[in-house]
Regions:
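N-terminal [4Fe-4S]-dependent radical SAM core
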Residues: 1, 53-57, 63-101, 105, ...
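A general structural detector for well-ordered alpha-helical segments in enzyme core domains, enriched
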Residues: 20, 56-59, 151, 175-179, ...
Length: 310
């Protein structure tokens, strides 16, 4: 059987895609990445998507679809879920994708994790990438895992650098700080501050005092629980008072304010050189506006006028 795998977000390495590949290769099937030019040559096509806003225009009725981008409650069949990951299908993937737990004990109304994966529970980690340079720990809330200490022991045993995707700052304590300091890390240590009504200053104090040798980044949700004033307060408080890099996550990516605010904060050159008020005054919304702005600057410069600087 000739099986094709269609990843609708090719910039993201999809672990489910790798498990489907492993399953079919174990059965002796020929597995490859999907190409529309050879559509009629495939016996079976799997299409994967993580996000509902991803364009599905090239998905055809004969494809087997999966992922939250198609159905929030979609699941892999158990015989595929039990398979290891076939990293060879993604040769540019230079890290291992590891879960020690699934689900979450919280039920935040903006998040699909609890609905999709249920209450937090431990899972056995899959195989490491033989060509991986580091381990990406995908747990939604690492320290909420009832067996997080066993997970730490496994990470020490693997002895590779780690990119941990996130943890709940509200649970953070001195024991966890000691554990984090003992682990090898790569890139940035990440956590979230979703609700501006959560006073997390004592946790931030502990974090910067104990994880001083790591770059810290905080995901800041906007457009759900917060006002624009609270959004600005959080990003300024994180950066000005703690030196923690804020990264804005818009709840509605199509909302003009949320898109504009995220662009300002997440572009660190803009965030560190302009106030929010200054950025709004000089906001450029598109490539066309930017090119028009450059033409105006050039004309003014030619007439010895003071050019507008965005």
């Amino acid at each position: 059987m000739r099986v094709a795998l269609y990843n609708l977000e090719p910039e993201i390495h999809n672990s489910a895609l790798m498990q489907v590949s492993q399953y079919h290769k174990q059965k002796g099937d020929d597995v490859c990445m999907y190409s529309p030019l050879y559509h009629n040559t495939y016996d079976k096509i799997y299409a994967f998507s993580l996000f509902d806003f991803t364009d599905k225009g090239y998905v055809t009725p004969d494809m087997i679809t999966g992922g939250t981008g198609f159905d929030i409650k979609s699941r892999l069949p158990k015989e595929i879920e039990d398979c290891d990951l076939d990293y060879s299908i993604c040769p540019d993937c230079d890290y291992s994708i590891i879960w020690f737990s699934r689900g979450c004990f919280r039920n935040c109304p903006f998040c699909v994790v609890n609905e999709k994966e249920g209450y937090i529970h431990s899972v056995e980690p899959k195989n490491l990438n033989p060509n991986g340079r580091y381990i990406k720990v995908m747990d939604n809330n690492f320290f909420a895992n009832p067996n997080w200490k066993s997970a730490v022991e496994q990470l020490h045993e693997w002895n590779q650098r780690i990119d941990m995707q996130g943890f709940d700052i509200r649970l953070f304590n001195e024991e966890q700080a000691e554990v984090i300091s003992s682990l090898k890390y790569m890139y940035t240590f990440k956590f979230a501050w979703d609700n501006p009504r959560d006073n997390i200053d004592d946790k931030l104090d502990l974090l910067v005092d104990t994880i001083y040798n790591r770059k810290l980044m905080c995901y800041v949700l906007i457009g759900f629980w917060s006002t624009p004033e609270e959004d600005l307060m959080r990003v300024r408080h994180l950066w000005d008072d703690y030196g923690i890099d804020p990264y804005v996550m818009p709840y509605n990516k199509f909302d003009e304010y949320q898109r504009k605010f995220a662009r300002w904060v997440n572009n660190k050159v803009l965030f560190k050189t302009r106030t929010w008020e200054e950025y709004q005054d000089g906001y450029i919304n598109s490539k066309e506006e930017y090119e028009a702005h450059l033409r105006v600057k050039e004309r003014r410069s030619n007439h010895n006028e003071i050019p507008f600087d965005f």
